[in-house]
């Protein structure tokens, strides 16, 4: 019986799932928006949101926990230097999922997952280059 078992299996074994979400979390932190299937986006939210919460308080212990979950020093640096301070005043809900139709090959529902302030973070840079 599967009573109280949370999370989607996504037709993968546990190590494949863990590696996939570790890579997807790194891509989301690096690019701040990625396109994936809707079920993967919903599960990725459960991985990324605790990382942002961890990054809000900068300590050696939190950096080591973040590294254990991402295995990438570049991602840890961006989490603690940029994303943690950016979301310091927000109490959760750091990501947004936008549905974007269906994939051509297998009709899988697709979605963008991004950080909620992604538009505001990129808009000033675009204005600065226009001037």
Swiss-Prot record:
Determine if Ribosomal protein is one of this entry's keywords: yes
Asked if the record carries the keyword Ribosomal protein, the reply is yes
Set out the biological process GO terms recorded for this chain's protein. Answer: translation
Q: Name one Pfam family in it.
A: Ribosomal_L17
Listed A to Z, the keywords are:
Ribonucleoprotein, Ribosomal protein
Protein name as annotated: Large ribosomal subunit protein bL17
* InterPro entries xref list: Ribosomal_bL17, Ribosomal_bL17_CS, Ribosomal_bL17_sf
Underlying gene: rplQ
- MF (Gene Ontology): structural constituent of ribosome
Gene3D superfamilies listed in its UniProt record:
Ribosomal protein L17 (3.90.1030.10)
Q: Which domain of life does this protein belong to?
A: Bacteria
- PROSITE patterns, per the entry: RIBOSOMAL_L17 (PS01167)
Q: What is a single cellular component term in the Gene Ontology annotation?
A: cytosolic large ribosomal subunit
Q: Which family is it part of?
A: Belongs to the bacterial ribosomal protein bL17 family.
**Could you give the subunit structure recorded for this chain?**
Part of the 50S ribosomal subunit. Contacts protein L32.
Originating organism: Sodalis glossinidius (strain morsitans)
């Amino acid at each position: 019986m599967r009573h109280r078992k949370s999370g989607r299996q996504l037709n993968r074994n546990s190590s494949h799932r863990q590696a996939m979400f570790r890579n997807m979390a790194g891509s989301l932190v690096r690019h701040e928006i990625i396109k994936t299937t809707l079920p993967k986006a919903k599960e990725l939210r459960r991985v990324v949101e605790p990382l942002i919460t961890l990054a809000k308080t900068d300590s050696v212990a939190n950096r080591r926990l973040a590294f254990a979950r991402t295995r990438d020093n570049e991602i840890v640096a961006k989490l603690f230097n940029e994303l943690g301070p950016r979301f310091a005043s927000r109490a959760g809900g750091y990501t947004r999922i936008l549905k974007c139709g269906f994939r051509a090959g297998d009709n899988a529902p697709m979605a963008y997952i991004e950080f909620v302030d992604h538009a505001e973070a990129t808009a000033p840079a675009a204005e600065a280059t226009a001037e």
